[in-house]
């Protein structure tokens, strides 16, 4: 525990187990039974917070609440404690002459962290604090370990992630973050359902790792004796459903990528992918900004949010900027005129952009963007027109086939969404997959694998389609002002704890 040495901890463990033994000796179940609550702490505040001390005394409002003891004080025949539930804390006042000898003894010997139920009357103290005067006190669960020091909480950030249950007990901010996360996903579903989308479920284990450029996790199916991959994207199964006639589909689910851990990356994360027949990337741009603005309004009550030092305006319409124009604007390099690989490499050298020898012109354009532009994009910005070399599943632009009808959304210098007009030409798609295979042979283990079954599905005919993927964890980070992805994942990936 943070501010407690091993000797102190061991002493507390011994004392609490002695109390546990004493409770059982008295015939009291220290891990009790169902308790009927009439109100939460927020109910008490919203219903009775505006009443005066005198009004509450006159009304004698009876309530029953339950929660965890977070503070406790008093001696003799009366004492105070603060009891915490999901949304907050409320003070309780326990008098021996009101609850009786046995229940007062339970209160007196209760420890911080114990879960209790209280029946009583709502009142206000002389200083105006809304409280409950107990008429009944029930021990619901005996806590056998002491909570972290109430004044310091969990100082060790890693401990917060490893022992999220302690973080949730001691940090209201952390609890609110995860309540907000749930609301964000709920509003996302509601928006799509109201706009005619069908929620579906597709496999998490794939025979071929496809739909993104990433290293997969592998597993083995014993009964079928075959290697499988944990999905790195949801995309290709959803597009098969578009072929099948499900015209507007989405899935919210876990995706797995065998890559590094950082403040923005976790190997297991949550995505939403959606696809709409007869739409294109411009339609999806509008849907994206409208949906994110809707979520912000419903969950936060505003489209103006604070993230770190930045005030972000999520009200549509957002900036739209071609990747080549963005590079020219922020670095001066101009890729609009067609050029050879040698010319592109020379341009990279002039602008101190690091590249690999195997890169084609499109890869070099993307490196320019990542190294010279990305960290400048603070307000919501759609970057569109990605090179075909880095977009194996996107449709080529009709006016300039070097580029694709694809966009990525950047906010606070982070990618939050990836979308495109889907490539529905099976011949072109096969050629793109073959080009990706050559990249794999040259050492790019994130290049796309060949997927013959997907090609066959396209051969039956997929309508023009717009598709979108949003990393939900990053969206939650944005809307809760969280600096690290670990702050919005209940149980993030961690190294084994060293003894």
From Swiss-Prot:
Mg(2+) 2 binds at residue 415. It holds the Pfam family tRNA_anti-codon. The lineage of its organism: Bacteria, Bacillati, Bacillota, Bacilli, Bacillales. Belongs to the class-II aminoacyl-tRNA synthetase family. InterPro entries: Aa-tRNA-synt_II, aa-tRNA-synth_II, aa-tRNA-synth_II/BPL/LPL, Lys-tRNA-ligase_II, Lys-tRNA-ligase_II_bac/euk, Lys-tRNA-ligase_II_N, Lys-tRNA-synth_II_C, NA-bd_OB-fold. Its cofactor is Mg(2+). It is found in: Cytoplasm. GO terms for cellular component: cytoplasm; cytosol. One of its GO terms (molecular function) is tRNA binding. Homodimer. NCBIfam families: lysS_bact, PRK00484.1. Keywords: Aminoacyl-tRNA synthetase, ATP-binding, Cytoplasm, Ligase, Magnesium, Metal-binding, Nucleotide-binding, Protein biosynthesis. It catalyses: tRNA(Lys) + L-lysine + ATP = L-lysyl-tRNA(Lys) + AMP + diphosphate. Disulfide bonds: none annotated. The keyword Hydrolase does not apply. Mg(2+) 1 binds at residues 408, 415. SUPFAM superfamilies: Class II aaRS and biotin synthetases, Nucleic acid-binding proteins. Its EC number is 6.1.1.6. It comes from the Bacteria. CDD domains: LysRS_core (cd00775), LysRS_N (cd04322). The keyword Magnesium applies. GO terms for biological process: lysyl-tRNA aminoacylation. Binds 3 Mg(2+) ions per subunit. This is Lysine--tRNA ligase.
